[in-house]
Amino acid sequence: AGGEWMEAVSDERLSLREWYHIAGVYEPGTGITLYINGKSAGTYESDADFEPAESADLLIGRHSIKARPSGTLRPHATAEIYTFFDGIVDEVYIMDRAVDKAEIDDYLTEFNPGSKSVLKERKLPAGRDGYGKFGAYYTSLKYYDAWDAQWRVDDHADVVVNFDDFPGRFVFWRGTSYIPHWVTGNGIWYNNEFTETWSETGCHEPMSDKRCQSSHVRIIENNPARIVVHWRYALLDNYYKISRVDSLTGWGDWCDEVYTIYPDGVGVRSVTLYSNQPKPPAEWHEGILVMGPGQRPEDILEPEALTLANMNGDTHTFSWEHGIPSEADGDGFVHVPQEANIHLVNTKSAWKPFVIVSPESDPAWDIYSHELQPGVSIFPWWNHWPTAMNPCDGRNAQHSDRASHSSLSHCFWNAWRETPGSVTKLMLNGLTPLSAGDLVPLAKSWSFPPKLTLVKNESVENNGYDPSERAYQIALTEKPSGSGLEFLLNGDPGSPINNPCIVVRNWGDVVPDIKVDGEKDQTGKTTRFGFRNSESGVDLIVWVKKDAETEVQISIEPATGIASR
């Protein structure tokens, strides 16, 4: 009107899955009046005459020009896009005159659809609810029809790990770019980030790979004793440019993450960054919570959202109730308790996400202390990821209208292994019903594992403990004889036994008879085994549900009267 664009914006937010009647009226001398369900919700005064658009299409539910989303944090790394209305539009009327409030009220009386929702609640898909058989399976998780229809995938796009002792899951879903999530029994999603680096075009990370063009997941092992899942991705920006491309080879930064997951809800994250500059500035961990539409960070997190602990059992809990925790220094780092290496997120759930790194890796922790929006949430809150397809490097969430995420912290710790072209780091992670201080025995058993002593050592090699698998490594130089093998785990308070795994290489295709301190498990719950094919033969994987600070004897013999598997 009058050669200028005008707009009226309401302060009222529309709730999800409810019908609203929206009317916009323009009248010279009055200007714009915006009505929501018959009530004035916004105005813009103007005396100018209305000027209809010429030579332009009439669009309903879509903007006519591309623009960056409102709330964009880094415009240089965010593309301009068309914005669409996500919902149902019905009974659209365009008048050639200004209508008054009485006419709007009459219309509402005649056509009021009521409060019944015709749209289903959108929940992040995590597979079957509740307890399931421990194991991993391929599937294509369903979110909602319009979102699912965008994908060029068939029936085996995602991976879900189920547990039989608690109702949690471990999920690799394309809607999160396959970034794996621990999902609690009541549907709270948590992840430990990925590797991330930066350039003048923005963040390079799998979060940018909205279509999963380089992010892939596959099941490596799947047996009653453990699950191994391999996730591989390139470090991409939002325009699918890979970081640090070598001018000679054409290779950029790639990452392999291998997750070894056990029935007790504990997994090892072994993450290897391959690069021609393997020690550039990079992140390897961030405590991230993911929410579905209708959820806010406050719905899934306690205000006292994070507890850190050290190997002495000292703990400290950090609160966001009054803003960034006051314990954070000028750079965001926290120093209580001293030498903390255990990280527990206080989700509103019985089982909570945890992280453990070795105390010998010199860990340091910081609080995510920027991009907060006081008055919107006490926690950082963004919705440029997950499930969004547009290239966007960061967008503040203003409302819970779509899937979103929040972050609490970062861990910085030393590498477990380095080569001229790679860096590997390790962490324990999973879900637990325990407090942070009560995770110390688990941390000790992994960081300072009990010594394994062979009792029957003929044709047997003891290859020690591999923290990247949370497993002892034994190799047979000959096929197992009738006497099998026997060993001791020498647990003590400094090196306790906690649900050990034993890998017996070259065991062969023979069902084992396993005894712990002379007792055989009759339930199949406390002693589990599986097999793994390898280049050298068939390996046996044994997992024992056992906590002890004393010596434990384990024997593994070929079962009599039972055929090979």
Predicted regions and their residues:
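Extracellular glycan-associated modules
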Residues: 1-118
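Secreted extracellular polysaccharide-interacting domains
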Residues: 2-10, 72, 240-242, 248-254, ...
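Beta-strand-rich N-terminal accessory domains
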Residues: 118-196, 341-371
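Beta-strand-rich recognition/accessory modules
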Residues: 134-146, 338-457, 534-552, 556-558
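Extended, loop-rich substrate-binding clefts of extracytoplasmic carbohydrate-active enzymes
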Residues: 201-270
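Acidic (Asp/Glu-rich), glycine- and aromatic
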Residues: 266-310
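Polysaccharide-binding surfaces and accessory modules of carbohydrate-active proteins
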Residues: 293-368
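C-terminal beta-sandwich/jelly-roll accessory domains of carbohydrate-active enzymes
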Residues: 437-565
